[in-house]
Amino acid sequence: MTAAVTENNGAGSGSSVAGRVVRVIGPVVDVEFPRGAIPELFNALHAEITLPSVAKTLTLEVAQHLGDNLVRTVSMQPTDGLIRGTSVSDTGKPISVPVGDVVKGHVFNALGDCLDAPGTGRDGEQWGIHRKPPAFDQLEGKTEILETGIKVIDLLTPYVKGGKIGLFGGAGVGKTVLIQEMITRIAREFSGTSVFAGVGERTREGTDLHLEMEEMGVLQDTALVFGQMDEPPGTRMRVALSALTMAEYFRDVQGQDVLLFIDNIFRFTQAGSEVSTLLGRMPSAVGYQPTLADEMGELQERITSTRGRSITSLQAIYVPADDYTDPAPATTFAHLDATTELSRPISQMGIYPAVDPLTSTSRILEPGIVGAEHFRVANEVKRILQKYKELQDIIAILGMDELQEEDKVLVGRARRLQKFLGQNFIVAEKFTGEPGSVVPLRDTIEAFDRICKGEFDHLPEQAFNSCGGLDDVEAAAKKIAGK
């Protein structure tokens, strides 16, 4: 093996100090360096390996100093073909990724390599992925609602501009579809820049997302960064930081409001757990890494608003076995401004988005921020739905006939509200054949207020299913009556 390795990741000159591999355990590689030339933590190292008919450069990230001139590193690529004695060079800086307009419309990996147009961005400005969060005096104190046009979200769990939103749910309840819908709406309605981080999810989903965004004409305003589930844990652990670094450039240098989508933040935690075990750390509760809270905090604290600019983050969070006490989702809760829980029972009823209106929360749902009228209507909707939930056991055992008359009226109203909370999505048009609806917040508040007051109790329940506004409900009711 050659002693010199050409640096190809990051801008600027590296230190090019040569070490050698002394131990390889899967993705964990121990490297020995000359005395006095030990690389810093998080530095990127390069090792050249030769496989049959192909030579490639491995990127290793320094994770621990072991003493005796040894460092323990985590490989960002499979270590097939890496042997003891292989020469390793220190780049002198962390993993760096391209930033700026050059990343829009392209797909990158965690190392900043462009996958759809190789070489894109490597000649321009690059930032290291390990960065400090904004100083306290730079943070934005003003609270502003991010209007999405999705009724259940805008009314019951309003998103804060520059905040962190969690999409909780088990497998197959619609987290990725809701993220795709938000990307489409932000690009179409607000002409905003989006950065998408695919963390440990299916490669097929990443391909589908790229093709759909290209088809809908929103790809040119979006940067995609993928570290999929077939890649080593080091890549899956760092891909969210790579995407966040690109988003920080748009916020701090270009002064833009940016949306950062992370799918799935649980895979970030899962990758950290794998790396922690490989590094020999003692596991904590349920086998997770002892540094879980610290790693989550380092990521989440960088996602914030500075004066006049913001990064709003929408994070899909897989809940293992639908257990919300699991340390991974529980640790994430502490950082979120709003939580949108996607419910399997609601999904099975055919109501989409399958948002649970009683368990989803938002810290800005208070009169001083959203206004007294919005607050009153949201609480009335929740009151009716909560009462309906309490009556369901009685209905299941004794039937509707045993309810008092006022409870029968409330149940009918609750079912209409429940169905009206769903609506057609733009990204689902080709599956449903129905156009997606965007409902202004003002219209949403008025519509739910009128339904709560009983103005539409005479219309059939099915007329409220997947409708946008009240005009759609009345049109559906006429269609049903015509049959």
Curated annotation (Swiss-Prot):
Protein residues bound to ATP: 169-176
Membrane topology, as annotated: Peripheral membrane protein
Class in the EC hierarchy, top level: translocase
Main location group: membrane
GO MF term list: ATP binding; ATP hydrolysis activity; proton-transporting ATP synthase activity, rotational mechanism
Enzyme Commission code: 7.1.2.2
Catalytic reaction equation(s): ATP + H2O + 4 H(+)(in) = ADP + phosphate + 5 H(+)(out)
One GO CC term, this protein: proton-transporting ATP synthase complex
Keywords: ATP synthesis, ATP-binding, Cell membrane, CF(1), Hydrogen ion transport, Ion transport, Membrane, Nucleotide-binding, Translocase, Transport
Cellular compartments annotated: Cell membrane
Gene3D superfamilies: 2.40.10.170, Bovine Mitochondrial F1-atpase, Atp Synthase Beta Chain, Chain D, domain 3, P-loop containing nucleotide triphosphate hydrolases
Its biological purpose: Produces ATP from ADP in the presence of a proton gradient across the membrane. The catalytic sites are hosted primarily by the beta subunits.
Record's subunit section: F-type ATPases have 2 components, CF(1) - the catalytic core - and CF(0) - the membrane proton channel. CF(1) has five subunits: alpha(3), beta(3), gamma(1), delta(1), epsilon(1). CF(0) has three main subunits: a(1), b(2) and c(9-12). The alpha and beta chains form an alternating ring which encloses part of the gamma chain. CF(1) is attached to CF(0) by a central stalk formed by the gamma and epsilon chains, while a peripheral stalk is formed by the delta and b chains.
HAMAP family in UniProt: ATP_synth_beta_bact (MF_01347)
PANTHER family referenced in this protein's UniProt entry, alphabetically: ATP SYNTHASE (PTHR15184), ATP SYNTHASE SUBUNIT BETA, MITOCHONDRIAL (PTHR15184:SF71)
NCBIfam families the UniProt entry points to: atpD
Family statement: Belongs to the ATPase alpha/beta chains family.
Entry protein name: ATP synthase subunit beta
Natural source organism: Rhodococcus jostii (strain RHA1)
